[in-house]
């Protein structure tokens, strides 16, 4: 509508502006409010899903007993188990839930980063140092650190410069995840979507709900894996794939029990 008001020629209305409809700014403003309300609504999950609701899968199956009243099966990864009562307070639960999901994502990336370079090195790809906990120390060597073993890719010689780059890049991503940015508005900081979901995996509510469960399950396994990688590095001084190869070659002598008993006093 080119104009929302007009002056009528009738004597009784002469010189008076009569409003025929809402202005463009009002239309746009209302549209924005409606869009935000729609985007902010949680996507519902059908009650037939085995991962949500009161009849969801529990941590001990049919022997799980009664779940705490505050664990209703609303969120992914809720198996009705909270012996320490960490989820009893809603605010604490919301904070811990966000921390868990973020740590899950970092652990999945970290586990892949620990295994993949060593896997490539064992298959003929040349790295300066493929073992994850030894690679970073190469920056203190005389020649510095070459990313992926390629001096023409990224040649790092300053740990402070690496730290600054990490803070800037990770801070920018986290800031956008929480507060939004020029690429779009973020409605849910935990599942921002938009530019963080270029493949549109979250478009279907049912598929998205199942992907949330898969993410939290794989993330919890990844956190345990990272803990195991740290312990292996301290005890054996080897990477995860080398430890796996040693175990498969001699499972009787190369296992967690034998390594643990080496620390028994008097042995």
UniProtKB/Swiss-Prot annotation:
Q: What is known of its domains?
A: The N-terminus of the protein extends into the stroma where it is involved with adhesion of granal membranes and post-translational modifications; both are believed to mediate the distribution of excitation energy between photosystems I and II.
Q: Name one GO biological process term.
A: response to light stimulus
The protein here is known as Chlorophyll a-b binding protein, chloroplastic
* Protein residues bound to chlorophyll b 1: 59
- List the PANTHER family hit by this protein, alphabetically: CHLOROPHYLL A/B BINDING PROTEIN
Annotated family = Belongs to the light-harvesting chlorophyll a/b-binding (LHC) protein family.
Where is chlorophyll a 4 bound in this sequence?
218
Q: How is the cofactor bound?
A: Binds at least 14 chlorophylls (8 Chl-a and 6 Chl-b) and carotenoids such as lutein and neoxanthin.
Function according to Swiss-Prot or TrEMBL: The light-harvesting complex (LHC) functions as a light receptor, it captures and delivers excitation energy to photosystems with which it is closely associated.
**Species for this entry:** Spinacia oleracea
Instruction: Please give the start and end residues of each transmembrane region.
Output: 101-121, 153-173, 221-241
Q: How does it assemble?
A: The LHC complex consists of chlorophyll a-b binding proteins.
Record's signal peptide: none
Q: Where in the cell is it found?
A: Plastid, Chloroplast thylakoid membrane
Extent of the transit peptide: 1-35
Q: Which GO terms describe its molecular function?
A: chlorophyll binding; metal ion binding
**Binding sites annotated in the UniProt record for chlorophyll a 6:** 247, 256
Q: Where along this sequence does the record place binding of chlorophyll b 5?
A: 166, 263
